[in-house]
Amino acid sequence: AAGYKNITVLDISAEALEKAKKRLGPKAAQVHWIVCDITTFETDTLYDVWHDRAAFHFLTAPAQIQNYIATAKKAVSGFLAIGTFSKKGPFKCSGLEIIQYNETELKTLMEDGFNALNCTTENHTTPFNTQQNFLFCSFKRL
């Protein structure tokens, strides 16, 4: 919440949100917290920036992916940033199935509503000191 206003944080896990609130301390009161599955999230709010740090790769059913994209197209007025496992990343995460993406696949999924700006891959070191390769892509709403 460093200088930004009107921040919303959404996660399927109430426990994860509680941990984030504790890390922010008193600044947590400045954030709108939502416990929800992103594939069922409905809002009339427009967001200047939507940052998905690692949810998209957990959407494994075509309907989930399409619901996510439809929600983003409705809710994003500015920029969308997605971090997802690359083709060099793990096949599962936290025991759950995931989908790996390459730059072309992610851009193709988003092309109906977003212009791709930049994509990059990077290794992320987990708390267990293992490496996971991520693909990060940024988009601008058409």
Q: PLM features: what roles do these ranges have?
A:
Residues 1-45, 59-142:
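Class I (Rossmann-like) S-adenosyl-L-methionine-dependent methyltransferase catalytic domain
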Residues 51:
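A conserved beta-strand element that flanks and buttresses the S-adenosyl-L-methionine
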Residues 54-58:
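Short catalytic micro-motifs in class I SAM-dependent methyltransferases
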